[in-house]
Amino acid sequence: MFDPKLKEALGRVQKPGRYTGGEPGSIYKEKDKVDVRFAFCFPDTYEVGMSFLGEKILYELLNSHENWWCERAFMPWLDMKAEMERLQLPLYTMESKDPLTAFDAVGFTLQYELSYTNILAMLDLAGIPFYSKDRDDRWPLIVAGGPCACNAEPIADFFDVIQLGEGENQLPAICAEIEKAKKEGISKKQLLLNIAKIPGVYIPAFYDVTYHEDGRVKAITPNEPGIPARITKAIIKDLNQFAPPTNFVVPMVGAIQDRASIEVLRGCVRGCRFCQAGFLYRPMRQRDASLLNKAAQDLCANTGYEELSLSSLSTSDHGQLEELLDDLNEWAPKEHVSLSLPSLRVDNFSQSLIEKTTKVRKSGLTFAAEAGTQRLRNVINKNVTWDEIEKTCTIAFNAGYTSVKLYFMMGLPTETMEDIEGIAETAQKVVDLYYKNTNHAKGRGVQVTISCACFVSKPHTPFQFVPMDTAETLQAKQKHLLESVHSRKIKVNYHDSTTSFLEGVFAKGDRRLAPVIVEAYKRGCYFDGWEECFKYDTWMQTFADLGIDPAFYCQRPIALDEVTPWSHMDYGITHEYLVREYNKALAAQTTPPCNRACNACGANHLLGGPCFDYSQNLV
């Protein structure tokens, strides 16, 4: 039975299915028979959170322990948030409907910098104090992990525990320490000291930060005995030890990505200098084709999904991809399951690949060119040429495709207006290629979509040292791009430059931003990643009122020897390598994929040996 307050709220909101739970695949346990209760919180709407593969992996993993129960919670949309505040209904989990305060640990995934105010909103709805220092032993442990943990300093003061790296070993180890602490009755301080011994775990309270007079970080030092000066990320050396989930919670309300999804590999060999994920998840590791095929078949059978996505940063780099597709095509067409590869690369796309992914249904193809000129592609180490783009599009058009989306970035280091014009010229050349191709789909026109993101300088990349373009400069470049497109066959989409600016501030920010985030939330800022909710002027006024210049964080160059807010976080990539790649970028020199030759980035030390067997061609 629903709580009467919840029942009343559900009758007054759109999409009440976001909040009811009871979805197929949900896991239920008896509360009095579990030792650890963990609430996995996604700081965005149900539809966004239910698309996140990481939650599905950890949900199944934690619940595989009989005496632990992992449940889910999401950020309620505006109408439900207002109803919960009006009715004084605390934020609850989907499974038990218990408030977050009933849990031993509340974990947030940090996928996007503009979700930070949503984290505060969820804590606020739960009645949990924002700052770790204000929570004693009576409160749940507040935990975070995910890609933004690589520099979580702007929100570090809110969390008791932050996980760096991959959570398959970390999170169960944390839960084991919580279980032990409950049985032994130890204090929160001692629990945190115990958790700090787990590889890849960062306890912000155990580090002090000092600053130079000009605002730059001076030093980050441990304040407890035995705490490491640098925290090295956790890594799964062999992905085959962790089979992909074979059952998902199937959402009541359509998720943004409502399909079966299998992670085929982790990491990337390419070394695109702007791509944070490519550096955070090094080195690349892949699962065996036989394991993936069985997991995929079981997952589709258990969930009823009719679309299967082979997910990764660069799926076409899997060394057994053709073999895997052959195995999948033995059963997928019979079950009316279509296959999708969301991360195809122009330089290893083939006729064979396209044939094996269109057995059931064709959809548009998406490729990342990233820059409009070869010079700028060399700067960012996007080793793609026009000849490869032409070859790929020809294969696609011969196969009957009439829709191509091209991803680009704007505001890249050394970019000029000539590079912006190159984006439009590349799209026009693709349009022309379609109509010159006598094998294109008869009676149908082509649609080429330019999707243009704003470059954001991110930690742990060679471009962490460079400033971002101002919002005004980005807007001028967007205007120039629109003026450079002269065909109705080309559609242009681009990101809002002001949200990208705020993303850049938090990406490279420090602990002095925490009060700004709290104050902005109190002034009505949340769902900052949603265009209709973003309050840029409120953010800028909040920065001004608190005496902080946001441009200091993202629109000034960082000296190559500067201590950064993330200097104490070790993701396996050496500082020397990042500097070397930065200098090569300025000289427009490229670096080959690391499976062809080791580029000495340092990630091999995480594995205790070479990342690849260089005696054989893996790609």
Task: Map each language-model feature to its residues.
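N-terminal [4Fe-4S]-dependent radical SAM core
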Residues: 7-39, 46-47, 204, 210, ...
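N-terminal pre-triad scaffold of radical SAM enzymes
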Residues: 38-44, 62, 248-276, 300, ...
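Canonical Radical SAM [4Fe-4S] cluster-binding loop centered on the CxxxCxxC motif
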Residues: 52, 254-290, 597-618
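Conserved SAM/AdoMet-binding glycine-rich loop
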Residues: 40-41, 105, 114, 298-405, ...
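Glycine-rich beta-alpha loop elements in corrinoid/cobalamin-binding modules
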Residues: 75-222, 459-510, 518-532
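Short secondary-structure boundary/capping segments
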Residues: 55, 87, 123, 157-162, ...
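Radical SAM enzyme core and accessory elements
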Residues: 1-27, 38-40, 486-619
